[in-house]
């Protein structure tokens, strides 16, 4: 996690902990998170609590700060799909839909790899596929996540605002 980010959770696992007066703390084993919160912060702009999905895992192999993470967490909101692209409004009976902003953390606890994804729970697979075809790069996914977390709306790419009258 980054400075200011926090993980709180409960779970279970088979752990071995070693500590002596002349040695550093050592931890071994896997801890499966059953319920928890990842407090995500980005500079002074975003502070959101993502719900950690059951089955997320922290694996310890000695130094607790070198633990490996495989954490999947979501932040739920409602957003208007037509902000992303007007054609998506044709695919759904309603344009305000539930959206899961998905935070994926893997790698070492000290320097995790962070990536994002989006889900449309309750929507059909075709609608989600179309949404993801519009968000086809990591940069665009990150931009969409930031807009959703800050403004509760999708980022509208510049090309969607153009029409044939703009050209001379």
Residue ranges: model-predicted function:
Residues 163-168:
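Short, intrinsically disordered, charge-balanced linker/junction segments flanking boundaries
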Residues 159-161:
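Charged, low-complexity interaction regions
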Residues 1-157:
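Strand-loop-strand
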